[in-house]
Swiss-Prot record:
Matches recorded under InterPro entries: ARM-like, ARM-type_fold, Hsp70_NEF-Inhibitors
Family (UniProt): Belongs to the SIL1 family.
Record-level Gene Ontology MF annotations: adenyl-nucleotide exchange factor activity; identical protein binding
Described function: Required for protein translocation and folding in the endoplasmic reticulum (ER). Functions as a nucleotide exchange factor for the ER lumenal chaperone HSPA5.
PANTHER family linked to this entry: NUCLEOTIDE EXCHANGE FACTOR SIL1, PROTEIN FOLDING REGULATOR
Single GO BP term: protein transport
Signal peptide, first to last residue: 1-31
Assembly, per entry: Interacts with HSPA5.
Name of this protein: Nucleotide exchange factor SIL1
Post-translational modification: N-glycosylated.
Species per Swiss-Prot/TrEMBL record: Rattus norvegicus (Rat)
Compositional bias of kind Basic and acidic residues: 45-60
């Protein structure tokens, strides 16, 4: 009879074998499931490449979409993927949760940046910000534009000027066709002198030539050119004419030529102009002629100490005294007084300047010291003459006389104190100008003309006490 059951010693090995088989199957299945985590070769590179590709695609998708702007507050807020924040916000990563968070950094500084932001709008990048290169480029373009505009304006201006004027060559050509010659100032003066000196010229033509010549000799160079070709001596000789008009306009030309022109002044003294001028003033002549001659004399004497010496030697002070005392020439009295004042102050300033600069006897200073003007004025009775002229009715004349009295005060003090008429005149003028100065003050003029005259009178009265 066959046995019904296997012995226990044989069943044990079979059970163990079956268990090992099941364990091997289970291990194989698990290894297949986790092969990526437990493989001997690490596919990290390919994994990163896949993730980078996904991130790039995600960023492109976010760029294509309208970014949602998160409005930060003073509290930390979670920042979701795809959300944008304004510039200046404070962003951090929460290490506990791994989430990006955002909040305001300084509310008072950045609040104005996001007040205008609204959800659903694209992030507004500040387009008003420029780099230094942008600014340099813009400035260069601006300068180029300005230069272009300036050049256009300049061209337009030149075109306008060209329309108003014509080329000199074109004018010369037309003048040649019309037999008209363009003359220089020198040529014009030569022509005028020839016309004046011609015996065939009428009186009117001679006077017209002198009148035109006076216009040109105002310029220093033209006056010296007049001297260079002998025209000055021709005009000086015109002072000997028997025609008062010729004397008048010859003196008119000489006065313009002498003015502030030392070279011409020297030649005039050597040419006998001073003697001729004094003769006209000392003789009976029309008043207009004497006015022009006195003008020429003043131009010759000013800033020319040698001429002043010759003036005193030739009896110039006596000639002027006689001129002032003429009843018909009272209008010239103020001009004579003004000339004397200028000569006195000119010498005074020259000596003071020499002392301040400590110059050792220059030639011009020596010439001024040889001019004995103040003693001559005292001897010739000018202390009394100037005091009498203070009675003139014109305010301007009184001003000039007061200036001269002040300049002569050191020389004529004793004479002024003895002059009772001068004291009465000063008292009368003092009362008159006090009233006029009061009217000026009422009108709001603190430094008016009459106050200045009153101050001069008060100062003179004080000096004579």
């Amino acid at each position: 009879m066959a046995p019904q059951h296997l012995p226990s010693t044989r069943m044990a090995p079979q059970g163990m074998l079956l268990g090992l088989l099941l364990a091997s199957c289970l291990t194989f299945c698990l290894s297949c499931q986790n092969s990526n985590n437990f493989a001997l070769t690490n596919p990290e590179k390919s994994t990163h490449e896949d993730s980078d590709t996904k991130e790039t695609r995600r960023e492109e998708e976010l760029d294509a979409e309208v970014l949602e702007v998160l409005n930060p507050t003073q509290e930390w807020q979670a920042l979701q993927p795809g959300q944008a924040v304004p510039a200046g916000s404070h962003v951090r990563m929460n290490l506990q949760t791994g989430v990006n968070e955002v909040k305001l950094q300084q509310e008072d500084k950045f609040q104005s940046n996001w007040k205008g932001f609204k959800r659903g709008r694209r992030l507004d990048i500040n387009t008003n910000t420029y780099t230094s290169q942008d600014l340099k480029s813009a400035l260069a373009k601006f300068k180029e534009g300005t230069e272009m505009e300036n050049s256009k304006d300049e061209l337009a201006r030149q075109a306008t000027v060209k329309q108003l004027f014509r080329p000199i060559e074109e004018l010369k050509k037309e003048f040649d066709e019309l037999n008209v010659v363009l003359e220089t100032d020198m040529q014009i003066m030569v022509r005028l002198i020839n016309k004046f000196n011609s015996s065939s010229s009428s009186l009117e033509e001679k006077v017209a030539a002198l009148f035109d010549l006076e216009y040109y000799v105002h310029q220093m160079d033209n006056a010296q050119d007049l001297l260079s070709f002998g025209g000055l001596q021709v005009v000086i000789n015109g002072l000997n004419s028997t025609e008062p008009l010729v004397k008048e306009y010859a003196a008119f030309v000489l006065g313009a030529a002498f003015s502030s022109n030392p070279k011409v002044q020297v030649e005039a003294i050597e040419g006998g102009a001073l003697q001729k001028l004094l003769v006209i003033l000392a003789t009976e002549q029309p008043l207009p002629a004497k006015k022009k001659v006195l003008f020429a004399l003043c131009s010759l004497l000013r800033h020319f100490p040698y001429a002043q010496q010759q003036f005193l030697k030739l009896g110039g002070l006596q000639v002027l005294r006689s001129l002032v005392q003429e009843k018909s020439a009272k209008v010239l009295a103020v001009r004579v007084v003004t000339l004397l004042y200028d000569l006195v102050t000119e010498k005074m300033f020259a000596e003071e300047e020499a002392e301040l600069t400590q110059e050792s006897s220059p030639e011009k200073l020596q010439q001024y010291r040889q001019v004995q003007l103040l003693p001559g004025l005292r001897e010739q009775g000018w202390c009394e003459i100037t005091a009498q002229l203070l009675a003139l009715p014109e305010h301007d004349a009184r001003e000039k006389v007061l200036q001269t009295l002040g300049a002569l005060l050191a020389t004529c003090r004793d004479r002024y104190r003895q002059d009772l008429e001068l004291s009465r005149t000063l008292g009368s003028l003092q009362a008159e100008y006090q009233a006029l100065a009061s009217l000026e003050l009422q009108e709001g003029e603190d430094d008016g003309y009459f106050r200045e005259l009153l101050a001069s009178i008060d100062s003179l009265v004080k000096e004579l006490r």
